[in-house]
């Protein structure tokens, strides 16, 4: 029995007539961090958005092939339930224009989960999980938009955790952060993979090498190579992968 929580089979995606993803096939292991790397425009963020159907919001999209979460086709899952199970954190922190506490209980309210006491306990537990409880426990009524960029991003991750996802999608979560804040978010990812499965899109190859267990290199809509991160970075099997990670292009 395998431990794959997410699989793609012959996945293709078109923006109008533009073929953005081409026959993508790979498996994601449970409780792992999988990094998607490649030059701008290669399709890695488009692929990430497929996994919780965020691309459905874009006009003139056409897809073929299959995506499975726990062997269930995502098209057969209620989209609200899918986005509860497969949560996403975006490139720039996007807290809601509420208080810190309002952000933390928003998902619970939307999904009708828990009474007032349970919501408060869940908010505390998830803030603790991302290392923010001590910093924010006396600031729960503070507008979330007043926080620093790093704290906003960690708050967005904590907010996602309240609805107990299985898979966390991170689309360049550190691109707006300084090196110290980036290090903290990377440490958080390493802690979270004990309980969750994480996919991250990153332009930072050093970050991919530091935090991920598996790496996929994408180029012009193709998944050129996928494997264990140590193998991808030390002995890639495709010369295009080697060219990218050694800086010959990208």
Residue ranges and their predicted role:
Residues 66-81, 141, 232:
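ABC ATPase NBD Q-loop/coupling interface
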Residues 168-171:
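Catalytic Walker B motif of ABC-type/P-loop ATPase nucleotide-binding domains
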Residues 142-147, 151:
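Conserved ABC ATPase signature
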Residues 71, 117-137:
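Conserved ABC ATPase "signature" region
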């Amino acid at each position: 029995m395998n431990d794959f929580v997410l699989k793609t089979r012959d996945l293709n995606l078109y923006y109008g007539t533009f073929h953005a993803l081409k026959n993508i096939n790979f498996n994601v292991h449970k409780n792992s961090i999988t990094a998607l790397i490649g030059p701008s425009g290669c399709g890695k963020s488009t692929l990430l958005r497929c996994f919780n159907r965020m691309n459905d919001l874009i006009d003139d999209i056409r897809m073929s092939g299959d995506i499975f979460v726990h062997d269930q086709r995502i098209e057969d899952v209620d989209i609200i339930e899918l986005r509860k199970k497969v949560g996403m954190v975006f490139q720039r922190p996007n807290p809601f224009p509420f208080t810190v506490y309002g952000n933390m209980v928003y998902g619970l309210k939307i999904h009708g989960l828990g009474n007032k006491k349970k919501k408060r306990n869940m908010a505390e537990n998830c803030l603790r999980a991302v290392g923010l409880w001590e910093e924010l426990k006396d600031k729960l009524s503070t507008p979330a938009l007043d926080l620093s960029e790093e704290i906003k991003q960690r708050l967005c991750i904590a907010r996602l955790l309240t609805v107990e996802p299985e898979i966390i999608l991170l689309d360049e979560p550190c691109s707006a952060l300084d090196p110290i804040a980036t290090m903290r978010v990377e440490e958080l990812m390493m802690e979270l993979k004990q309980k969750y499965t994480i996919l991250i899109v990153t332009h930072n190859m050093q970050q991919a090498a530091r935090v991920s267990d598996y790496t996929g290199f994408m180029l012009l809509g193709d998944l050129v190579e996928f494997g264990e991160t140590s193998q991808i970075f030390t002995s890639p099997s495709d010369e295009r992968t080697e060219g990218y990670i050694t800086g010959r292009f990208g």
